[in-house]
């Protein structure tokens, strides 16, 4: 694995060919029947741009005008669906359910078969320009091998030395991509932020509430 990663870094190995070879060696299962029925579609005259802003480990009760005013104001201009449940309480199963709309218990079967979600397949069939930007690496969990398995030149990771720095880099990269993309095609943007997961803030960030922990030791957390 180390040898492969080193040779890939210097361009001596075709990463896509390597992934195809790995997929061929996986123990494929036959118990996955997804989707259950053939998908019926209708012609779309003018596909709309779609943006998903996803924040890992963000507590739902902090989505309000006081705690997150910018996101709150943005949401007031659209539709809010507040009766939906996550398919899991961790990153792997939560993102999995968002794209596949099935429980996270199907993760392994989908992964070994490299089965992409109907949603992503439909976007690509409609010739969407795909802007996939994540702070954390898309290789752990292995979203590059299921959700985004068919996305060419997938952006695997962000540049930065901290969770907050990775989030900033993600935003800057997306802005650059969106400004230079092919405007003749519709766009799907997936922005996956991670700072709440790592409990990290940009330098000089003005805190909203006091007292406030500088860092969190998860092993010492209790109800008090």
Pin down the residues of each PLM region:
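Active-site-proximal alpha/beta segments of enzymes that process anionic O-linked groups
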Residues: 1-218
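Short, intrinsically disordered, charge-balanced linker/junction segments flanking boundaries
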Residues: 219-224
